[in-house]
Amino acid sequence: MPGLGRRAQWLCWWWGLLCSCGPPPLRPPLPVAAAAAGGQLLGAGGSPVRAEQPPPQSSSSGFLYRRLKTHEKREMQKEILSVLGLPHRPRPLHGLQQPQPPVLPPQQQQQQQQQQTAREEPPPGRLKSAPLFMLDLYNALSNDDEEDGASEGVGQEPGSHGGASSSQLRQPSPGAAHSLNRKSLLAPGPGGGASPLTSAQDSAFLNDADMVMSFVNLVEYDKEFSPHQRHHKEFKFNLSQIPEGEAVTAAEFRVYKDCVVGSFKNQTFLISIYQVLQEHQHRDSDLFLLDTRVVWASEEGWLEFDITATSNLWVVTPQHNMGLQLSVVTRDGLHVNPRAAGLVGRDGPYDKQPFMVAFFKVSEVHVRTTRSASSRRRQQSRNRSTQSQDVSRGSGSSDYNGSELKTACKKHELYVSFQDLGWQDWIIAPKGYAANYCDGECSFPLNAHMNATNHAIVQTLVHLMNPEYVPKPCCAPTKLNAISVLYFDDNSNVILKKYRNMVVRACGCH
């Protein structure tokens, strides 16, 4: 009576579960059929054999995607770098990644914090003045994209807004550079208020530019000048890494001015920027005046000086790049130290330090680098398989009967995540973008939702009569948008670049 004994075991187990206050006793083993129903199959010898698990997937704001294998990720990185026009992955000295400190006892942690406070260690690269200025430019571009295609969600990760928030990348203090409590030197923004770092002129330059680069001051120690120029300050910038084909459309030197509260609080200052033409060992350097500004002692904000002419010269002939000099003169003709006039130098707060920014426009069409042979072979094999499928489908007019069950040509979602590619240490913004793609059937009759061209309509009719000789129209993008990418280069300079035709806005039959 094997069946009766098994039922008796089950009754005893349930009785113990009801009458016991502690955990239930061990459940008796199930028959093979019940075990299979529970999700685990028993193989030969009683060993468990589990069904093959699906490949791991991730989700990003509603997008589900398969994790790339190592070689797939490497190939994807190479191809996207080629699209971005970069020969290799940038590795900035001061990027976005901060090394995680080791876990220390509380007493040692307190000592370490005191040492860091005394040392005033520099913050991450993203919290300095140049990256913050570039981030404002990036947000200005992103806001324009949102106004142009708010209904499309173009270039954004779903659930996000195209621009990167400045508050996410910086923690402003009460005396931060962008808090202008007195008369501002900044031009009012489009909304009537003063922008944190950018001005209306910067926005105009941005509309005409394909790329914007910021440059940090390379001078670490003040130079000994002659008595006549003893209050001059020197600045040098490296413009040797400008991509080929880029021409300077505008360039600015930006320096922050604090409110003067000392002995010069009622003064008016003439601030001048000079290009160094030639340096001499025993006399003053030869200088060329580039731009001047007259400011009051009570004014506070960013000063902008036009250095477009000298920047073009430095790009064409780098050997002439001997830097800039800044001088400050009172209305009485007295040369004073720039610090006495409220100008912040390299030893000031990191979000107020001077920097240079240049706007570029491409002078020739960018040509992508040649792909590897393996990529071409894979593409050719895919093309051959696609052609064979097209030949097999084009056997007669019955193709249209089957295509009615297929999806019509339309836009589909495709999200490219820079973070999943491991680029979060050098790409400041965005974290990724919605590239999208076009797919679907272009079958007769072509309705208005397919955005078909007149040529596509004629080709569809001819294909209907001669499917063996004339293929159907293809589902392809009809409108493409650009994206903007903000990133560090190898020298920790910040670059904002526009990339055209990166986002599919609409699809149609061609």
Swiss-Prot record:
Chain segments carrying region Disordered: 87-129, 143-199, 370-402
Maturation propeptide residues: 21-371
CDD domains in the cross-refs: TGF_beta_BMP6
Biased composition (Polar residues): 390-401
SUPFAM superfamilies reported for this sequence: Cystine-knot cytokines
Disruption phenotype: Deficient mice are viable and fertile without displaying overt effects in tissues known to express BMP6, suggesting a functional redundancy among the factors of this subgroup. However, these mice show a significant increased liver iron content.
Key words, A-Z: Chondrogenesis, Cleavage on pair of basic residues, Cytokine, Developmental protein, Differentiation, Disulfide bond, Glycoprotein, Growth factor, Osteogenesis, Secreted, Signal
Disulfide bridge positions per record: 409-475, 438-507, 442-509
Signal peptide (residue range): 1-20
Tissue: Expressed in the lung. Low levels seen in the kidney.
Superkingdom as given in the UniProt entry: Eukaryota
Primary location: secreted
Biased composition (Low complexity): 106-116
Biological processes, Gene Ontology terms: BMP signaling pathway; cartilage development; cellular response to iron ion; cellular response to mechanical stimulus; endochondral ossification; eye development; immune response; inflammatory response
Key word Disulfide bond present: yes
Keyword Ribosomal protein attached: no
Molecular function in Gene Ontology: BMP receptor binding; cytokine activity; growth factor activity; protein heterodimerization activity
Biological role stated in the UniProt entry: Growth factor of the TGF-beta superfamily that plays essential roles in many developmental processes including cartilage and bone formation. Also plays an important role in the regulation of HAMP/hepcidin expression and iron metabolism by acting as a ligand for hemojuvelin/HJV. Also acts to promote expression of HAMP, potentially via the interaction with its receptor BMPR1A/ALK3. Initiates the canonical BMP signaling cascade by associating with type I receptor ACVR1 and type II receptor ACVR2B.
Family: Belongs to the TGF-beta family.
Subunit details: Interacts with SOSTDC1. Interacts (when glycosylated) with type I receptor ACVR1; the interaction may induce HAMP expression. Interacts with type II receptor ACVR2B. Interacts with Hemojuvelin/HJV. Interacts with ERFE; the interaction inhibits BMP-induced transcription of HAMP. Interacts with BMPR1A/ALK3. Forms heterodimers with BMP2 in vitro; the heterodimer then binds to its receptor BMPR1A /ALK3 and may induce HAMP expression.
Name of the featured protein: Bone morphogenetic protein 6
